């Protein structure tokens, strides 16, 4: 009987948490459940991951080259696909948990999406074995 009560309590807490997150999401168009991409994304195939990394590196290098020559070319940064970056970060985290990447590999991402501004900051440090 006690085990049944504990099980019902855990289920009830999960339902209440899900309902609260749903209500919050309905009030705010920009709300995302914490770890949204971790929970909802599949592992990326190697070819897709390499393509995303290559595009991201090319775009950021173009921007930094322009910035070093006195040009602020924000059109280059606008071409960065935030979804691809989120999927890459999720994939790196998933691999790191499984032990698939070097333990010294680090990554960090932070972003905000609001009606008046969008921001995405990320860093990935990869080390050879």
From Swiss-Prot:
GO BP annotation list: entry receptor-mediated virion attachment to host cell; symbiont entry into host cell
Organism: Human cytomegalovirus (strain Merlin)
GO CC terms of this entry: membrane; viral envelope; virion membrane
Name of this protein: Protein UL131A
Source taxon at top rank: Viruses
Intracellular or extracellular location(s): Virion membrane
Record keywords, A-Z: Host-virus interaction, Membrane, Signal, Viral attachment to host cell, Viral attachment to host entry receptor, Viral envelope protein, Virion, Virus entry into host cell
Subunit and interaction comment: Forms the envelope pentamer complex (PC) composed of gH, gL, UL128, UL130, and UL131A. The pentamer interacts with host NRP2. The interaction with gH is important for the formation of UL128, UL130, gH-gL complex.
Signal peptide range in chain numbering: 1-18
């Amino acid at each position: 009987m006690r085990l049944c009560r504990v099980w019902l309590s855990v289920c009830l807490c999960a339902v209440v948490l899900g309902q609260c997150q749903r209500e919050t999401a309905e009030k705010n168009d920009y709300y995302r459940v914490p770890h949204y991409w971790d929970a909802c994304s599949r592992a990326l195939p190697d070819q897709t991951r390499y393509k995303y990394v290559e595009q991201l590196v090319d775009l950021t290098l173009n921007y930094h080259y322009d910035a070093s020559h006195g040009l602020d070319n924000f059109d280059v940064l606008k071409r960065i696909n935030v979804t691809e970056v989120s999927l890459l970060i999720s994939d790196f985290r998933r691999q790191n948990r499984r032990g698939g990447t070097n333990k010294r590999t680090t990554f960090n991402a932070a972003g905000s999406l609001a009606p008046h501004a969008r921001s995405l900051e990320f860093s990935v440090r990869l080390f050879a074995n």
